[in-house]
Amino acid sequence: MLKSIVHEIIGAPRRTLDFPQSLQQFRGRKRVLIIFADAQDDRPLIQHQWLRKAHMRLIEEDVEVFSIAGGGAFALFDEDWELDADDIRERLQGPPPGEFGLILIGRDGLVKMRSHEPRHAEDIFKALEMLPRKALWQ
């Protein structure tokens, strides 16, 4: 968070993130929404409820949703994927264990949105509207 504040105030360049190896399978094909759901409050539950209500739209927008909790990564909806939760948390500079976070990743592998609070599906869809519909490279 401090890095983000410094970047906003003085324009210091952000460190380029290494894309997590276990998310490479989505690069150029899908958008990925990661929910860090270890928080000991109701934020993960609220976020999951909001996303479940928007399930069909998430499918239409080619968004895979994963929840990271307890050292594991789990698909919020149907498919099971082999993901390395610790690598994702580290490389995407996710919140520390025990904290809530949300990260939206575009098809290009770049982080498009971060939040430490649950976001309504419409907020996520607005962020998606700013992204290309199809991958520019494969």
What are the roles of these predicted feature ranges?
Residues 1-138:
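Non-catalytic interaction/Regulatory regions outside core domains
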